[in-house]
Amino acid sequence: MVTTRARLALAAGAGARWASRVTGRGAGAMIGGLVAMTLDRSILRQLGMGRRTVVVTGTNGKSTTTRMTAAALGTLGAVATNAEGANMDAGLVAALAAHRDAELAVLEVDEMHVPHISDAVDPAVVVLLNLSRDQLDRVGEINVIERTLRAGLARHPDAVVVANCDDVLMTSAAYDSPNVVWVAAGGAWSNDSVSCPRSGEGIVRKAPSQEDHWYSTGADFKRPAPHWWFDDATLYGPDGLALPMRLALPGSVNRGNAAQAVAAAVALGADPAVAVAAVCQVDEVAGRYRTVRIGAHQARILLAKNPAGWQEALAMVDKHADGVVIAVNGRVPDGEDLSWLWDVRFEHFEKTRVVAAGERGTDLAVRLGYAGVEHTLVHDTVAAIASCPPGRVEVVANYTAFLQLQRALARRG
């Protein structure tokens, strides 16, 4: 039960949310959460009481894994979740307030907010996906984040930590926790973990097929043996478990997300086979991966926010589609330093015609030129799609370019 003050705070938040909607200023979840938090600073703790909560965090894949975990846990009962990805305090308050009676919760949480959010909601499970630099002007943060996560987990020894053992930094964050479920969820991007986060010495990597395929040359720190892993068709788990897993979402990275989602749900009592069936039904995440008709084109929309995310998203692109559009902005939420474009291997598209789009499409066009990729430049993303031959078009956009495209599509109806 929440206090009288909390009930008043939630009522005020609901009023603010309603006002935001009727005045056309947005869905109102954030402002509703902010108002409630302003009136009662303990509101998040009160809303989290009495629930079994999963906290999901990492640089990439948070929204997708949250959506999959919520689907898997939905087989056990009602689930409160921040499905639209508002992953800081106000968004979490709004999500929990909207589902007051749900005894289960799955919360996507920004990496730096995990410790104090965990202190408030006392999670039963914490899912650690991956850590890499999000923006070049924030490159130093990943080691700080790892240490912050490690310290935060130490305050919750009873939580089950579902950690990606292919990611050096997340493995370090979870390494000292007493209840860890290790998942081999993949770690194709290794540029941000060349040194051991514990000793500063080098990390040696072997082929993934070999045992201990990464280890530190300094501290006694190496890749743990996974409890869960996957291949193209099957998810493997404890005690010889092997379940067919054919996802609606593309890419190896999403099979890794699904493996961690299933492991988290099983930790809370879900039946593994039922959980796998549920995650396989997820076909869209807040507009990502969806296919929309735009005139004579069927456009599939992918989101990429940082070098690691771009590498994964570009790997999902069907190079044999009728058109490929890559849209890049350079606003503050994207990171204004776009030199990361030179870290992404666009050379894979040397036999594919690409349309460079977005406010920083010219920067992208220069990079594509050096990569030997045939390209044209059309700054408006919708116009870029229209410039492609009729048929299927693959669209990859960074954060604000993705939002602009979503708004443009909404206006078109």
Task: Label each residue range with its predicted role.
Residues 1-33, 266-271, 277-413:
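ATP-dependent carboxylate-amine ligase
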Residues 4-182, 189, 195:
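Phosphate-binding loop of NTP-binding sites
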Residues 5, 181-308:
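Adenine nucleotide phosphate-binding catalytic loops in nucleotide-utilizing enzymes
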Residues 42-71, 246-248, 264-266, 276, ...:
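A short, flexible N-terminal coil/short beta segment enriched in small residues
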Residues 69, 73, 92-96, 258-268, ...:
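Buried hydrophobic packing segments
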